[in-house]
């Protein structure tokens, strides 16, 4: 039970990095000697010291003969920082307990093997499912090459997202919108469509002042990182004057053809081929994976939402339901053309249902 206690502490530490570590995984480390925590730390930002290094610095000489609990296999390769395996070996750690192996091909068991070769007692698999939940995006990208996609939808009780006139602000509550801010902050990128940009002119930024107090305490304003904003714009309809381009951070456009407009340096273009007359979403996701995008939060209209669902690209559905009815003339939740049989319907299963102010948030994953 002691091992579980210390690993749970390491997992809790790892969660603190979930806003800032992209494209790296979230990792926590706790060093224990004679039943006392002598060092702990978590990975805070890509390019900065890993969790093990922070914990070893805190432990100092007490690390010798101690047990290190780490939520992911210690790295064994030279990247932007030196290998954590070398640091653990040099510190004289006697035992390493890892929650899981690292699927990164540059590590993939080599770290644990190196520790064993140095005479360290090594085990892995403790609280592995919890560790995997912590790094869903990183793990999916490493295993498949694709980012982890969360599709956010907001609707009325009768599944409507806007009035017939297009009016949609606001169907859901201020509490739900604060929850969306937290979800944005945890995501590596936010995806939308040119139709949404033209209709709503959104900023699609993380607004620190709108985060809940608990998130603000974990995520100081000076550390604020804006997710990459990605716009699917196959007809080059978005202009440099739109708000999404004017915000801090990067904006990427997925296009099927070059655009001749003058864009700020923070704008990038990804040229993606067409498939059946539309931008190929599968190729786009492959390209984003190659760009080291771990997780994508989608905020878009019914057309893009439906296209992602029909392409089988959605890993999670996050649906905010407001306790109001908009009527049959209002706009529907998503467009799924050609769907005629129940057997062909995209299937999900409920993972969590929670109250968010007066609304309900449905959290679903692929069946």
Annotate each predicted stretch with a short phrase.
Residues 10, 28, 75, 115, ...:
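Residue-level signal for inorganic ion chemistry
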Residues 337-367:
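Conserved histidine-centered catalytic loops in small-molecule metabolism enzymes
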Residues 103-106, 129-130, 198, 237-239, ...:
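Short gly/pro/ser/thr-enriched loop/turn and capping motifs at secondary-structure boundaries
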Residues 31-130, 309:
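Zn2+-dependent cytidine deaminase-like catalytic core
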Residues 310-348:
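Flexible, gly/pro- and Lys/Arg-enriched active-site loops
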Residues 2-22, 141:
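Short, basic/aromatic recognition patches
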Residues 140, 150-157, 161-294, 303-306:
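Active-site ligand-binding patch in enzyme domains
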